Amino acid sequence: MDGTDVTMLMREIGVRARAAAAELAFAEPSRKEEALNAAAEAMLARSDEILEANGRDLAFGAEKGLTPAMMDRLKLDAARIDGIVEGLRAVAGQPDPVGQVIAEWDRPSGLHIRRVRTPLGVVGVIYESRPNVTADAGALCLKSGNAVILRGGSESFHSSGAIHAALQDGLRQAGLPVDAIQRVPTRDRAAVAEMLRMVEHIDVIVPRGGKGLVGLVQAEARVPVFAHLEGICHVYADGEADLEKARRVVLNAKTRRTGICGSAECLLIDRAFLAKHGPVLIEDLLKAGVEVRAEGELAQVPGTVPAQPEDFGREFLDMIIAAKVVDGVDEAIAHIRRYGSSHTESILTENDATAERFFRRLDSAILMRNASTQFADGGEFGMGAEIGIATGKMHARGPVGAEQLTSFKYLVTGDGTIRT
């Protein structure tokens, strides 16, 4: 496909998306819910087709030499399809955000003012190897009354296509425009460049992928961007941490799934914790098969690898973690400020004042206490699904669910009221 053809294709998709968005903006909540539940049923009916398409993508990924983490993100199986289906049903059951009254008040002038949620319009989602993003993004945009243009990575091309077909089945059954959820039907990278320039057709771009993709989108987009940067997540074991809680959380935060953005990439151990309990957290990780890149006295633990400066502030997405000793919560905070990506940090402590200091003095999108960073997920937050974890400070932060995909307008009611 040459450049002219890609430009025309994307313009046509944009025009259709804008028309669909105008209709979706006033669609009844029951019709959107019906579409999502029907899409879930279609996903089950098409599961063999989806798995066959995913097999083709996995073969393509292996030929390209994708990393184990990327292959894990790409892979679908019956359990993961069930997870997608449950995600669709969960989003369907969420309260519809469109039209919700955020605030209302009366003015001395006699005016009654309401601030209510409205759709953003058209959302463009650019993502890499995760085919489930097709379903999550499509569902959340539909729930929030937005049309969406999906541009998946070349690795998940066939899987995304099969999932997209199920989403459109749901739209048809509910009598909603199929153009509400469109997929860019080409691997040509020129389509991404076109999306980033489509200010007349797209209201916001959501990039979902690695640092390279997000950086490209931020540098070149003329459309506003919800940035999802790297998940350089930290776990800090305070001197007053409960040992058994700490052992459970650290192991889960690193090893449950290493290829997701909520996986812990750096472990900070307070010197007081080390004095009480020894290097037990490091030993647990080593026994689980994690490569521990350790600094200072932790590098003396048998089986560890000496950390290099570049290991801190790095997203491994693998069975690797950086580790160092810190003197108190303030040193942990300073380290996270320097090396973190404003994604998710967890403190392990039984001291309320220390936890509050950690919460107040860090400004990551998600801060946790005595909980695994792997909970940094829209589904786990009760949103049904997420379109990404926004690490910026404008508009949306943290898991981006249906509510975060809305703006607002003011509805002002008077009674022949005039301004003097």
From Swiss-Prot:
It catalyses: L-glutamate 5-semialdehyde + phosphate + NADP(+) = L-glutamyl 5-phosphate + NADPH + H(+). Keywords: Amino-acid biosynthesis, Cytoplasm, NADP, Oxidoreductase, Proline biosynthesis. Pathway: Amino-acid biosynthesis; L-proline biosynthesis; L-glutamate 5-semialdehyde from L-glutamate: step 2/2. One of its GO terms (biological process) is L-proline biosynthetic process. Its EC number is 1.2.1.41. GO terms for molecular function: glutamate-5-semialdehyde dehydrogenase activity; NADP binding. GO terms for cellular component: cytoplasm. It comes from the Bacteria. Pfam families: Aldedh (PF00171). It is found in: Cytoplasm. Belongs to the gamma-glutamyl phosphate reductase family. Catalyzes the NADPH-dependent reduction of L-glutamate 5-phosphate into L-glutamate 5-semialdehyde and phosphate. The product spontaneously undergoes cyclization to form 1-pyrroline-5-carboxylate. This is Gamma-glutamyl phosphate reductase. The lineage of its organism: Bacteria, Pseudomonadati, Pseudomonadota, Alphaproteobacteria, Rhodobacterales.
